[in-house]
Amino acid sequence: MYGIEYTTILIFLTSITLLNYILKSITRMMDYIIYRFLLIVVILATIINAQNYGVNLPITGSMDTAYADSTQSEPFLTSTLCLYYPVEASNEIADTEWKDTLSQLFLTKGWPTGSVYLKEYADIAAFSVEPQLYCDYNLVLMKYDSTQELDMSELADLILNEWLCNPMDITLYYYQQTDEANKWISTGSSCTVKVCPLNTQTLGIGCLITNPDTFETVATMEKLVITDVVDGVNHKLNVTTATCTIRNCKKLGPRENVAVIQVGGANVLDITADPTTTPQTERMMRINWKKWWQVFYTVVDYVNQIIQTMSKRSRSLNSSAFYYRV
């Protein structure tokens, strides 16, 4: 009887010792694997340069400021550049080979053939309906026109900032704007926007909610409308929904992979919506030339300096996606 008990105890102690040895062996093996893995990660991290999409650069820039005309020593081998220009530029140049010529000129500044895309738009109004900015860097050329100054300012505000937008059902709901960053953005072939502010009893202030003719008109037959109303007040809206889509949008911050180059005009357009803030010229630049070839030559000369005022992003702007960052 005692022999059986001693044997049981001996087996138990032996099992514990063996288990302890196995656990220590596994621990040493795991430590070896983990330390080796970390060593490999550290070595690779020093070799590989990863793209950081979260860098916020201090953005200033105006072609009114004197920049040194020089070529970057490091070519942008892994980036794409989109240059948007009005159709009047190609009409004036009237040369079927002009894009090839321009591509070769960009090559002298370090931009390989195939990395620069030249995209044409009809006019400011048409470009406002569905701006699509898909390249790593996007330069938009806008010819100054005193009759379209406000349209240019709205378009610049749209494409130079990131917006988070949601659809609005204006037939069922009232809407209010919560702060200065909250705007209603309407786009379409023809947008007429009317608003009626409401009091706490949901009665119209200076208007009848049942009669859109009494509403205040904030836009008439435009292609892009950024509507700003009194914050914290409910509004009944009337929009030409057959030809226009309105969205409730929140400005998230600057879209740093886009720059606007204004061609002509006495001063760079100010896109500041809030009158209490300092005027903004972030990534808004101006050059003055009568001929479009001179404009393109200047863009090529200064393209690398302009890119330095921007930040490469993986996001794109697409109106069909409610301008949301994708």
Curated annotation (Swiss-Prot):
Disulphide-bridged cysteine pairs: 82-135, 165-249, 191-244, 196-207
Region annotation CNP motif: where it falls in the sequence: 165-167
Subcellular location, principal: virion
Residues bearing attached sugar chains per UniProt: 238, 318
Region (GPR motif): 253-255
UniProt keyword annotation of Transmembrane helix present: no
Top-rank lineage group of the source organism: Viruses
Assembly, per entry: Homotrimer; disulfide-linked. 2 Ca(2+) ions bound at each subunit interface in the trimer hold the trimer together. Interacts with the intermediate capsid protein VP6. Interacts with the outer capsid protein VP5*.
Protein name: Outer capsid glycoprotein VP7
